Amino acid sequence: MSKLIGEPVKVHRNKDSTLTSFIWRKRFYRVDEVISWWREPSEWWNGKAMRLFVRVNARNSSTGTYELYKLGEEWFLHRVLD
C-alpha cells in the first residue's frame, strides 16, 4: 500500500548530490538509504520537464520508505510506502 502526498519538501544533498535528508511538514527525515532513481515525463503534452524520482528509506521517529521527485528546481514528496 502507499499514500499519495504531492506536497513540497526541502531536500538536503551532499557535495556529490546524494540525497541526505528532507523536511516535510516541519519534520526532519534523515535518509538512511537511496533505493533507486528514475525519470518520468511530466505532462509532456504541455511541454513540462521530466520529473526525477528517488525512492529512499528515511527515518524520523521510525523508519519508512518515501518517494520524492524533482520538477524544475522544486522537490515534492510523491508518496509514502507502507
Question: What do the PLM-derived regions correspond to, one by one?
Answer:
Residues 1-82:
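N- and C-terminal low-complexity/disordered segments
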